Every structure is written in structure tokens, then in C-alpha cells.
Amino acid sequence: MMNIILKISGKFFDEDNVDNLIVLRQSIKELADNGFRVGIVTGGGSTARRYIKLAREIGIGEAYLDLLGIWASRLNAYLVMFSLQDLAYMHVPQSLEEFIQDWSHGKVVVTGGFQPGQSTAAVAALVAEASSSKTLVVATNVDGVYEKDPRIYADVKLIPHLTTQDLRKILEGSQSVQAGTYELLDPLAIKIVERSKIRVIVMNYRKLNRIIDILKGEEVSSIIEPV
């Protein structure tokens, strides 16, 4: 059995689309039927951004803003966990230690954020490392990695293959790791996938029904190789 971690962008939940959850459940079942063991990490999305914005406007400190974002991501994790029903272990871990313990039960484990100052991308990299997963799939609202945001710049082309060093260059000077902007791995997540030689696949969550083909390299996505 092959272990993989699926990081689901918070934008997946912003769409309020029940079909997203139905397709996600079907995709997880298909992965299990094809010999994959899956862990899932959820982002906080607009729920996190809304609470963070309100709290910041009344002067709440950054550590507490991080906690609001973490709890929003965990709310999304509960939604996914409940939608998976018997496929999932019925507990959302709040730390890496809890994730490892839950993972030992043999079912899908769904988690959100862990601690302030740490993105859910970094959490996904950490749990990939802890579960001995050699592939981390990042499902977001674009088809892969671009040099610039494809939703703003119509002429940019998808980069099908790149290294973590290439990704660092793309991220240099950008604001793409801030809430509400084009999402890629943050520097901490990159360091983790490099040290454990974890391959990263960036895909569009609207193509989750093709995830087996994406893992085989037969569908549009970006593959990031650790170096």
C-alpha cells in the first residue's frame, strides 16, 4: 500500500458546492481501491480570512489571529471527515503527535492546522513526512504551478515539471503565500519535502475525479521534484 497526503485548498470550501464533497468522497474511495492510504489536510478558506479580518480590525494580536485560522481549517476538516463517514477515523488531530496516533488506526485521517505561525501547507508536508508518504498532492483552484497568477495573467503557461529550487525562485518577492492569494507551498513546507524527498503534485480540485490519472502523470498538473 502506498501512502499519500492530499492538501485541499480552503477555496474548495468557499464554493459551497456539495458536488465537491461528493466527488472528494468518491475519489478517496477510488484511491483506497487502488492501494493508496490517504491523509487529508484542509485549508481555512474565506471563513478563516473573514474572522482574521474582523479580529485584526479590533486590534487582536497575530498569534490569536493564527488560532482563528487554525480553528476555521479544523471546521473544514470536520466537514470532510463526516462526509467520508466509514472511510475516515472519527477524530480531527490537533498536533503531529495526535495525527501519528490516529494514523495507526488504518483509516483516512483528516486534519486542519496545528499551531500558530505554521501554514496548512507546512502541516501537509509534516504529516506526509510522518506517514512516510512519498507524494503530497496539493489540490487548489488552478491546474498547477505558474510563474504568475493565471487568474490575472491570461498569457501565462503552466509549468508541468519543476524542482523545489525552481519553486523558490517563483516565490521570491511574491505575496503568494498570504491569505487570499495564489497558493503554493511556503518556505517551511519546501524545506520539509526536500529533507524527506517528497514529490509534490499541484492539481485542480475540480479534477479530483481524475486523481488516479494525475498520479500516473496522464492528466494536467505540475510535478515538483525535491532537490
Curated annotation (Swiss-Prot):
Unlike most bacteria, is not activated by GTP. UTP acts as a competitive inhibitor against both substrates. High concentration of UMP abolishes the inhibition of UTP at low ATP concentrations, indicating that UTP binds to the acceptor site (UMP site). GO terms for cellular component: cytoplasm. Its EC number is 2.7.4.22. UMP binds at residues 44, 66, 114-120. It is an enzyme of class 2 (transferase). It catalyses: UMP + ATP = UDP + ADP. It is found in: Cytoplasm. GO terms for molecular function: ATP binding; UMP kinase activity. It comes from the Archaea. Keywords: ATP-binding, Cytoplasm, Kinase, Nucleotide-binding, Pyrimidine biosynthesis, Transferase. Its main location: cytoplasm. The keyword ATP-binding applies. Optimum pH is 7.0. InterPro entries: AceGlu_kinase-like_sf, Asp/Glu/Uridylate_kinase, Uridylate_kinase, Uridylate_kinase_arch/spir. Pathway: Pyrimidine metabolism; CTP biosynthesis via de novo pathway; UDP from UMP (UMPK route): step 1/1. Belongs to the UMP kinase family. Catalyzes the reversible phosphorylation of UMP to UDP, with ATP as the most efficient phosphate donor. Is also able to phosphorylate dUMP, although much less efficiently. Homohexamer. This is Uridylate kinase. It comes from Saccharolobus solfataricus (strain ATCC 35092 / DSM 1617 / JCM 11322 / P2). The gene is pyrH.
